[in-house]
Regions:
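Active-site beta->alpha N-cap acidic-glycine motif
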Residues: 3, 8-159, 165-189, 194, ...
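Extracytoplasmic/secreted proteins, especially bacterial periplasmic and envelope-associated proteins
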Residues: 42, 65-69, 126-129, 165, ...
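Short strand-loop junctions, especially beta-strand C-caps/beta-turns
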Residues: 48-50, 86, 195-197, 270-274, ...
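Sec-exported extracytoplasmic/periplasmic mature domains
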Residues: 75-79, 135-136, 175, 179-186, ...
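Short secondary-structure capping/turn micro-motifs that flank functional sites
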Residues: 90-91, 150-151, 198, 227-228, ...
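Short secondary-structure transition/capping segments
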Residues: 94-97, 154-157, 230-235, 346-349, ...
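Catalytic domains of cell-wall/extracellular-matrix polysaccharide-remodeling enzymes
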Residues: 119, 123-127, 133, 146-293, ...
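N-terminal propeptides
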Residues: 308-428
């Protein structure tokens, strides 16, 4: 395992814990989905950075591409996946390979998939057959960026990396892949994951702003399948076996300790080389799926998992569930960590997000960020609601709600989020 990656991740955790204030979640149209609430033994798997048009490494599958090997394995177990694909990294030059085993193994300034100078073997642009196979076999495709360029600075591990200059560039990059999938395959993308989970961008924007503009949800993960980290063994066979074990044993131990551990979870996987240019996922995926099968799990796409429940803290047993699901399709009611927090008091900012139209809330916030470089998460919605008399002009976003517009609500028992949403009159 690369010590610099380990050190970077550990350092980031320390900084977050000691120096950085706790992340403040807010109600928005886009939320980060790591898992959902369910008592059913159902979980999802995601596969980043493909499709890969090169064989597994080592190749013990008669020259089949890695993506074909993964699709064959999923089919064997009746499982479905969410393939978080890229478009094409062939524009990511000039560049050079970094040290094998490091985070820069495939490129110092940019990522290259499946490898530097092999860009024509990776991504949706160059792998029409693999994309069509994914779709024909019922898998989901999600947007991991056309060129897989990080959205902003990431000094701990990717300090030398080029990054997108801002909001417009990120929207343009995602739109290229979105358009490709729509025009070539008639497929609508609904989920996305930012390259290397970099969220903060220039100008005060974040990945959430970009995804709100695109109409996406943020697909994260709650369990790391571990296939991307290299072993330190010098012997190639020992290294491969160690990497396979690192993918299988944590899953085995988690299930032995709690058979319901993976209920509603999203498992991260890699559709490509790890940092040592091996593909342990080709050998470990079947072992993982066998384990999950033994414990009675169904492995589905993230989209299907969200049909079970789209929320982290509210499931089908909640009496308000169906209304909340319907509301969340057109209104901002869920926090960015995918929780509803129904029993807490609602604030005026959260009420404004419920009442303001999607385009108004987003466009006004974006305009304010362009103008000043600063904007609160509710500023766009607050601006609209003040102009239209839906909230008092003197109230602040953090104030508690004390009254509701009569025309839009039945009488509420109190102003918890649960009762406000229950009282809201759904549009016909």
């Amino acid at each position: 395992m690369s010590w610099i990656v380990k050190l970077g991740k550990k350092g980031k955790k320390i900084v977050k814990k000691i120096i950085t204030p706790a992340e403040k979640h807010y109600v928005g149209y886009t939320r980060r989905i790591e898992r959902v609430k369910t008592g059913e033994r159902i979980c999802a798997m995601t596969f980043d950075d493909g499709p890969m048009g090169l064989p597994a490494s080592p190749d013990r599958f008669e020259g089949k591409t890695l993506t074909d090997v993964l699709l064959d394995t999923l089919a064997q177990y009746g499982a479905k996946g969410s393939f978080d694909v890229i478009g094409d990294t062939s524009e990511n030059y000039p560049d050079e390979a970094g040290k094998l085993g490091s985070a820069a193994w495939g490129g110092v300034k940019f990522d290259h998939y499946p490898d530097i100078h092999c860009d024509d073997k990776g991504g949706a642009v160059h792998n029409d057959r693999l994309i069509r196979r994914m779709l024909d076999e019922g898998h989901q495709i999600t947007n991991h960026g056309y060129r897989h360029i990080i959205f902003g600075k990431k000094p701990f591990v990717y300090g030398a990396r080029e990054y997108l200059p801002g909001f417009d560039a990120a929207v343009a990059d995602l739109t290229r892949l979105d358009t490709l999938m729509r025009e070539r395959y008639g497929y609508t993308l609904t989920l996305a994951r930012p390259p290397h989970y970099v969220d903060k961008m220039a100008g005060g924007f974040t990945s959430y702003d970009v995804y709100e503009r695109m109409g996406y949800q943020y697909m994260a993960a709650s369990f790391d399948g571990a296939g991307w980290l290299p072993s330190t063994h010098e012997d190639p066979e020992a290294a491969l076996q160690a990497e396979i074990d690192a993918m299988v044993e944590p899953m085995r131990k988690a299930l032995e300790k709690d058979p319901d551990f993976f209920c509603g979870q999203i498992i991260f996987q890699k559709d490509g080389y790890n940092m040592a240019k091996r593909t342990p996922v080709a050998f470990a995926l079947g072992k993982q799926l066998e384990l999950l099968k033994e414990y009675g799990y169904r492995v589905v796409s993230v989209g299907e998992l969200m049909e079970e429940s789209p929320f982290t803290d509210v499931g089908r047993d909640d009496p308000l569930f169906e209304k909340l699901v319907a509301l969340a399709k057109t209104r901002a009611i869920v926090f960015t960590d995918n929780k509803l927090r129904l029993d807490d008091k609602m604030t005026v900012g959260e009420l404004a997000m419920l009442l303001a139209p999607h385009d108004e809330a987003i466009s006004r916030r974006v305009a304010q960020l362009r103008k000043t470089g600063k904007a609160g998460p509710y500023d766009g919605a607050m601006s609209y609601c003040r102009e239209n008399g839906l909230i008092d002009a003197s109230t602040k976003a953090e104030d508690a709600v004390t009254k509701l517009p009569d025309a839009m609500f039945d009488k509420a028992i109190d102003f918890t989020r649960r009762n406000v949403y229950a009282a809201y009159k759904m549009e016909e």
